[in-house]
Amino acid sequence: MFTIHETRPVRSYSGEKWFTNSSNKKRLAEDFKNKCGYCGDFDVYSGGYNVYHVEHFAPKEKFKELEFTYDNLLYSCPYCNLAKSNKWIGKTATESIVGDKGFVDPCTEEYDLHLGRDEEGSIIYKTSLGQYIYMELKLYLKRHKILYNLDKIRLKRNVLKEEIEKRKLKSQDFQDLEVIYNELGALFCNYYELIVEESPIYT
């Protein structure tokens, strides 16, 4: 079993408070490495930076004073952001969980206690609270597994490409690596076609 994020996102910005989503979004994208805080989807496969949202962990509709508080913000894909909307189980901004219902900040270690990935890349829940988050955020959508595997293939191809270039410079044989590189390219295209065939949002 794996964690949703290979590296847990950390909100590093602590400077001047910005009162626009656009200013906060730039810093969130850096802190979250351009991946959704909840599902880990890399924005490049879903329209890029402009398509992703600034998510308010404690909803701004209920806690207006936190609208531009950086520690309450996340970088989120539109699927997770729209699924969560202004859902909040507690009566205060700090009461995010009541019993086995509620949400966990993905920047905390606790998030990994409730949710993870199986060996095929699908998001899975580990606890009753994790199941609640899983269902509310629609983390069962196939796109999360597909995008996870797309990025794994991309990273493997990058490593192979570097090794191929090194062998070329040393006049060493590289055909074996080139075969694998091309096979991964075909696999990447197959996964990408699955995303194109995916149903529209919220189906």
Question: What would you call each of these model-derived segments?
Answer:
Residues 41-73, 84-99:
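Histidine-centered nuclease catalytic patch
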Residues 40, 78-81:
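Cys/His-coordinated zinc-binding microdomains
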Residues 132-203:
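C-terminal, charged low-complexity interaction regions
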Residues 35, 53, 76:
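The −1 position to Zn-ligating cysteines in a subset of zinc-ribbon hairpins
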Residues 1-38, 63-67, 71:
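Short, charged surface segments at domain edges that flank catalytic/cofactor-binding sites
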Residues 85-160:
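Domain-level detector of nuclease and nuclease-like folds
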